[in-house]
């Protein structure tokens, strides 16, 4: 019996150049995320290149909130420059003022009175809670939880009232001065902050009950946006972005400034470097901030915590109104200070503080005049945003907003 001939496989014909040109080729899809996207945290525009639902490339377009802050500061006296820093990270304004005041004080070689240091640290920790409350709750909102922002804003409202009672302004406080703070805190305000600290711990516990073990929240954040410690150092990360990857790096401990060396607090660190670890860190940092605030309040009430809230030199710090009504010399000092300002010795200095978003630095150059020659601002969010490309690569489109929420970006300081 003759075998049936084997079926020959059809030979593939190489397509001609004309046919290849006519065939629709596969290409990635490019979309705009923002600048009016609800999860964009301000005026962010991301150009995303997608392969289906998978992110291939992220291109952040910044500058939509650029106001030329660094250049404007060069044309203002050192006193007039302070309010510009409130408008950088406008979620926690006083932390930025702190860096600038420390830089000028270092050039002038002056020491701030102890009570002023305690007030500064107290309000910087209030700023940290303001920032973390907003971030943790909006990060939850970005992945679909709508209750946390309502709770968070209720507490932020109380903190903004503390800002207002100290400085007269809810957001742009301009409360810190070179040489101290503008006014002393009334005893009742200190008592109210103390009682708020006790009640706030319960709010943090309630937020954790809603989110920390929530199955949906964990699915959206665990193993998303993983950053190794090596990558964190390479990209110039700081703050929670470094601590989430396992490094106990906090300027309040490693390079203590003001009276942080006296404070007893812990530095929480993560081990996976993902969005969930960064969320857990911010929640724990709020608890540590409460610890620091309680210690500050106890020290403010102690006998050695009394006294002046600014230096005595009226050539640098404005004289009190009562003095001006009695002394012609004080009136002259006041007039000179607000018209001409004070002169800072020639030199350059870099001062960094542990702001809620990371290391906020001020590189200040003085030419001996009454205005800064150059004031370079090192914003932590700028370094974090530039890493969006490598963090988001390979993730789904829905993960982009979760990653963005965990980076904690505020555009005042990125665009400045």
UniProtKB/Swiss-Prot annotation:
<dbReference type="Pfam" id="PF00346">
    <property type="entry name" value="Complex1_49kDa"/>
</dbReference>
<comment type="similarity">
    <text>Belongs to the complex I 49 kDa subunit family.</text>
</comment>
<keyword id="KW-1278">Translocase</keyword>
<keyword id="KW-0997">Cell inner membrane</keyword>
<comment type="function">
    <text>NDH-1 shuttles electrons from NADH, via FMN and iron-sulfur (Fe-S) centers, to quinones in the respiratory chain. The immediate electron acceptor for the enzyme in this species is believed to be ubiquinone. Couples the redox reaction to proton translocation (for every two electrons transferred, four hydrogen ions are translocated across the cytoplasmic membrane), and thus conserves the redox energy in a proton gradient.</text>
</comment>
<keyword id="KW-1003">Cell membrane</keyword>
<dbReference type="InterPro" id="IPR029014">
    <property type="entry name" value="NiFe-Hase_large"/>
</dbReference>
<dbReference type="GO" id="GO:0048038">
    <property type="term" value="F:quinone binding"/>
</dbReference>
<protein>
    <recommendedName>
        <fullName>NADH-quinone oxidoreductase subunit D</fullName>
        <ecNumber>7.1.1.-</ecNumber>
    </recommendedName>
</protein>
<dbReference type="InterPro" id="IPR022885">
    <property type="entry name" value="NDH1_su_D/H"/>
</dbReference>
<dbReference type="InterPro" id="IPR001135">
    <property type="entry name" value="NADH_Q_OxRdtase_suD"/>
</dbReference>
<dbReference type="GO" id="GO:0051287">
    <property type="term" value="F:NAD binding"/>
</dbReference>
<comment type="subunit">
    <text>NDH-1 is composed of 14 different subunits. Subunits NuoB, C, D, E, F, and G constitute the peripheral sector of the complex.</text>
</comment>
<dbReference type="GO" id="GO:0005886">
    <property type="term" value="C:plasma membrane"/>
</dbReference>
<keyword id="KW-0874">Quinone</keyword>
<keyword id="KW-0830">Ubiquinone</keyword>
<dbReference type="InterPro" id="IPR014029">
    <property type="entry name" value="NADH_UbQ_OxRdtase_49kDa_CS"/>
</dbReference>
<keyword id="KW-0813">Transport</keyword>
<keyword id="KW-0472">Membrane</keyword>
<dbReference type="GO" id="GO:0050136">
    <property type="term" value="F:NADH:ubiquinone reductase (non-electrogenic) activity"/>
</dbReference>
<keyword id="KW-0520">NAD</keyword>
């Amino acid at each position: 019996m003759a075998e049936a001939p084997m079926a020959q496989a059809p030979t593939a014909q190489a397509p001609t150049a004309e046919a290849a040109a006519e065939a629709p080729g596969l290409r990635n899809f490019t979309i705009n995320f923002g600048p009016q996207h609800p999860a964009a945290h301000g005026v962010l525009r991301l150009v995303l290149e997608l392969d289906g639902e998978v992110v291939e490339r992220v291109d952040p377009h910044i500058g939509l909130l650029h106001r030329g802050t660094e250049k404007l500061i060069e044309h203002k006296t050192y006193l007039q420059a302070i309010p510009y820093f409130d408008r950088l990270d406008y979620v926690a304004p006083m932390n930025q003022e702190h860096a600038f005041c420390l830089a000028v004080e270092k050039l002038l070689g002056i020491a701030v009175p102890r009570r002023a240091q305690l007030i500064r640290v107290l309000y910087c920790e209030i700023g940290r809670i303001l920032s973390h409350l907003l971030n943790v709750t909006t990060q939850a909102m970005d992945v679909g939880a709508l209750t946390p922002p309502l709770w968070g804003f209720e507490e932020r409202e109380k903190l903004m009232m503390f800002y207002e009672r100290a400085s007269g302004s809810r957001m742009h406080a301009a409360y810190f001065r070179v040489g101290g703070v503008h006014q002393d805190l009334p005893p009742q305000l200190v008592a109210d902050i103390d009682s708020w600290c006790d009640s706030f711990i319960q709010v943090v516990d309630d937020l954790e009950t809603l989110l920390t073990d929530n199955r949906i929240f964990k699915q959206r954040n665990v193993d998303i946006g993983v950053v190794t410690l090596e990558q964190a150092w390479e990209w110039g990360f700081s703050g929670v972005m470094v601590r989430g990857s396992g490094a106990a790096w906090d300027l309040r401990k490693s390079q203590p400034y003001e009276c942080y060396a006296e404070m007893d607090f812990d530095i929480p660190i993560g081990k996976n470097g993902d969005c969930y670890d960064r969320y857990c860190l911010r929640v724990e940092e709020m608890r540590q901030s409460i610890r620091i605030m309680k210690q500050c309040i106890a020290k403010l009430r102690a006998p050695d915590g009394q006294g002046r809230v600014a230096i005595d030199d009226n050539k640098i710090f404005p004289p009190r109104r009562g003095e001006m009504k009695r002394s012609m010399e004080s009136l002259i000092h006041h007039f000179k200070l607000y018209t001409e300002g004070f002169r800072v010795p020639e030199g350059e200095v870099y001062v960094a503080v542990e702001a809620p978003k990371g290391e906020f630095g001020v590189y200040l150059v003085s030419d001996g005049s009454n205005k800064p020659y150059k004031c370079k601002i090192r914003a932590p969010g700028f370094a974090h945003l530039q890493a969006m490309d490598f963090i988001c690569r390979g993730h789904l489109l829905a993960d982009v907003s979760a990653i963005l929420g965990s980076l904690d970006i505020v555009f005042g300081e990125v665009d400045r």
